[in-house]
Amino acid sequence: MDKAGKSAALENLKGVFEGAGVVVVTHYAGLTVAEMTKLRGLLRKDGAHFKVVKNRLAKIALGGVGGDKAQDLFQGPVAIAYSPDPVAAAKAADEFSRENSKLVIIGAVMGEQVLDAKGVEALAKLPSLDQLRGKIIGVIQAPATKVAGVIQAPASQLARVVSAYASKDAA
């Protein structure tokens, strides 16, 4: 790779590290092209991406974020899974690594924080942003539904009383 190509790749990686909610670092040695394609499809479905990176460029792109721990993640054949959603990439990579032992999760960089493999596994168990939004909307709507029911209850009871008097008078 010539100098211009390296600088373009470096700028691309800087953009990835700045724009990602989480960057999961993996060893991918032994994965076939078909398995890599399947992994990329799984990640893409969740809005995440998978990219093989040069360790030296990744370390420079990190620019000291996460200190030595983050730098230590980039050794050997490394690829990154990243997404704006802090949970999506971790969840998809963890799911794939359970099915295929050739993909080994080393750790992750999440903002200034560096996670180990167990941290990534714990992150993968959290609900995604969309699931959290759904739960929040459900929590917000539940009291509103109850309030509407309480407000309607006296009116419906009054209507039943009037209806009962009307049917009593008719009889």
From Swiss-Prot:
GO cellular component: large ribosomal subunit
UniProt keyword rRNA-binding present: yes
Pfam families (UniProt xref): Ribosomal_L10 (PF00466)
Keywords tagged on the record: Ribonucleoprotein, Ribosomal protein, RNA-binding, rRNA-binding
GO molecular function, one term: structural constituent of ribosome
BP terms from Gene Ontology: translation
InterPro entries with a match to the protein in the record: Ribosomal_uL10, Ribosomal_uL10-like_sf, Ribosomal_uL10_bac, Ribosomal_uL10_bac_type, Ribosomal_uL10_CS_bac
Subunit structure as annotated in this protein's UniProt entry: Part of the ribosomal stalk of the 50S ribosomal subunit. The N-terminus interacts with L11 and the large rRNA to form the base of the stalk. The C-terminus forms an elongated spine to which L12 dimers bind in a sequential fashion forming a multimeric L10(L12)X complex.
Described purpose of this protein according to its UniProt entry: Forms part of the ribosomal stalk, playing a central role in the interaction of the ribosome with GTP-bound translation factors.
Family designation: Belongs to the universal ribosomal protein uL10 family.
Protein name: Large ribosomal subunit protein uL10
Species in which this protein is naturally found: Hyphomonas neptunium (strain ATCC 15444)
